[in-house]
Amino acid sequence: MQRREFITLVGGAAAAWPLAADAQKPVMPVIGVLESGSATSTTSLSAEFHAGLKESGFVEGQNVTIEYRRAEAQYDRLPAFAAELVGRQVAVIVASGATVSPFAAQAATKIIPIVFLMGTDPVQTGLVASLSRPGGNITGVTTFGSEILSKQLEMLHELVPKARAIAMLVNPKNPTHLVGKAPWQTFADAIDRKSVV
């Protein structure tokens, strides 16, 4: 799924929100953004997000409000932030960054649509049933794929063919930090190299 499709998902969810609105909800739809990182770590993503919303006819402050909750890499804050967004009755939750963001959003609501952007496999982590039919109130985009990881490892091997070991750096605080370990190990074994995670 490309950026345009991602923005269309978010825009479509925000556009559909007024149809289900009741007297208790704000007049202008609110998009809740739940991020595992900081504002500086997501600057380029935020610019693309706003540009895509504008292409879909949504301008922050004019016809949509965006509320950000950023965990600053303190993942234990995400469940409370997700609950805040649910309490705010947002139209859609955009969960990005570490896999814990969409999981926190998913645990907080089974009704509000959730659109995720993450770098791990959402099927392997148990977030969705499948990429084509995610199920429930969640859908999104992933930048992870075993094909991508295999290509990255292949390029690494071409750049440093004499390397005897290859290492993968992970964030041990991210509960899905070992998702890429199996394909990484498989590739390392195939080229007869030691793998360090």
Predicted regions and their residues:
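Short hydrophobic alpha-helices and adjacent helix-cap/hinge residues
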Residues: M1-V197
